[in-house]
Amino acid sequence: MAQLICEHLSLGYEGSEILHDLNFSVDAGDYLCIVGENGSGKSTLMKAILGLLPPLAGKVRTGDGLKRNEIGYLPQQTIVQRDFPASVREIVLSGCQGRCGLRPFYNRAEKALADRNIERMGLSDLQKRCYRDLSGGQQQRVLLARALCATQKLLLLDEPVSGLDPVVTAEMYRLIESLNREGTTIVMISHDIDAAVRYASHVLHIGKTVFFGTKAAYRQSAPYRRFFEGGDAA
């Protein structure tokens, strides 16, 4: 059953349309990779899914019992984020804020959840370290642990391996794949077409031609062929 549905979705800014009449759905347990040309609207779509940008037309809705506050988000890293002066545990625990309601403090269950996700991401030895002193790959694992404190159901990942070296990139992809195998639905923006067809179950290609379907069907599609013939820059 679909957890996320986009119906006849058109997006843009100040009346200027970037995406037109987009239709796709994400079922529980899917691993959807969103690829496309630079400026094609991938990050704009992510904003709409998060409810940060109202559609020009159409709608984004959730299903299968998924609530809006059960969508975890790993944004692209910025310089300000990389230099954030807080401990690893403090940052991971902040992912539980949506669970607190009006309470000013985290309860025992929320602290235990943060500790489990710290261990899950292999960060137990780093939890007292300052976030800004970590490597790029370690920082991404911290932010992923934080997102998992918000939800175990659906994660939105915006370029999660951007700026990472090849070894750490491969490690990050394996980690995301492991989360998906354990039941977390993944929606990931990526410039890496190879990773999309290696790890994802489904691909959404946004550009002059829009494709949505399984990765097997994507390998036979015109957008995929154009990319490898050098026609598109994803």
Q: What positions do the PLM features span?
A:
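Helix N-cap at the start of a conserved alpha-helix in ABC-type nucleotide-binding domains
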Residues: 166-168
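H-loop/switch region of ABC-family ATPase nucleotide-binding domains
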Residues: 190-191
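Conserved ABC ATPase "signature" region
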Residues: 108-126
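Conserved ABC ATPase signature
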Residues: 130-134, 138
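Catalytic Walker B motif of ABC-type/P-loop ATPase nucleotide-binding domains
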Residues: 155-158
